[in-house]
Amino acid sequence: NGAVMPGGKRTTVEPKDGGNVELTLHADLQHQVQDLLDARVAKHQADWGAVVIEDVATGHVLVMADSNSKEPDNAKPQKVHAVQDAFEPGSVGKLVTVGAALNQGTITPTSVFQVPYALNLSDAGGPITDFHEHDGETLTATGVLAESSNTGTVLIGQTIGDDQRYAMMRAFGFGEETGIELPGESAGLIRGADQWQGRDRYVTMFGQAYAITAMQEASALATIANGGVRITPHIVKSWTNADGTVEVPQGSQPVQAMDATAASQLLTMMESVVEDDRGTAGAAKVPGYRVGVKTG
């Protein structure tokens, strides 16, 4: 009841003024994207969805929309899917394979491949196929990415070693936390190349048999657009202490994840996903803008 016990000690902690935190989020963008995301999740009856938009030059997260977002006055704990849930990236993972091959110089954007519908590989446990059946095609590496060909990506992946692909995954930050200022971040799930057995060796080339978060995926795409330099993403721009001093978060040192020339080539190849007549993202065209995409 608050009464002091005889012989007891009283400890008083003086109140301390709190500070102010300024986020990197763009309020208008966040609101619009949140509405669009909620509508798409409802339309497709998905379990959840997340959208991350990152400024590639600064690492500032302009949007982090999550389908389970609640009103700000609801203080109950809730999961942030964008940083806490990992998933297989699927065909977005083809960027890692193509990027690694460009980085090693085993291909160029115009390298030509004879791409079948199915590849029968002795150690794959069954054929590797494309999403849709087709006759054999002659495609450049750019065409392989534009059409999102599984078999074409495997042919590209076979020009480099498994260790080189794994090194590119790690260079993009897969398998480690991004360092964003949010608790409970998942590092994703990725096994070393020496643990890729049978079919896993091939399906990792197109984004299966490993898992990353939406934040990791956004960071990897930002790295490509930033000349191959990976920087720590931030959702906190600064904070002001009670004494008026302003501090900004410090991330880890930038990492040159891939050669700048290779990154530029890959970014241009991503534009073909939108611009090519057989590209998988023609609907993403925005008049007056160059748009680079990889569908998943």
Model-identified regions with their sequence ranges:
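Extracytoplasmic/periplasmic proteins that interact with beta-lactams or build/remodel peptidoglycan
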Residues: 1-50, 70-73
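Beta-lactam-recognizing serine transpeptidase/beta-lactamase-like catalytic domain environment
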Residues: 3-9, 51-87, 96-296
